[in-house]
Amino acid sequence: LAERQLIDASDRRNRLLRAQIDLWRQNPPVKRIVAAGTTAAFPLMKELVKTVLSLEKGELYLAGIDKFLEDEAWEKIDETHPQHELKELLDYLTVRREDIPDLQAPENFGREVLISEVMRPAATTEKWRDIAGKKIRHEAADGITLVNCADMREEALTIALLLREAG
């Protein structure tokens, strides 16, 4: 690539992100800047989100962040957990989950609590014994189907077929 005076896509992306970060730090925009829907999975993206939050009118919205999980369990999220990248981002930003505004109010509050419990970090599953105290209504499970699969291949095929039917 160097012989042809070219750079690869990730290098280009990083240069563009660095330029945007530097521009906003040197000349903060007066208009509203929103960072939304990112997990900021790589360092420069995290830095860009941090820069957005430092702006006078900078805002951050993260869809799908689990705000129902208690803090003790949140701290036990490991790299295998679906919320891990969001947790890493918030830790980097030193922002609490509660401080991230919701994009919209939950349509089914009970379902949100149920999903939070289902996705609870493995190190805290002893808390499942207390789930009755959360008063999750039966309607929270409406539309949810349990499919038992023999292996990961069958699971992947089942998911693919269900997504095809839904689409």
Describe these PLM feature segments.
Residues L1-G167:
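Nucleic acid-machinery interaction/catalytic patches
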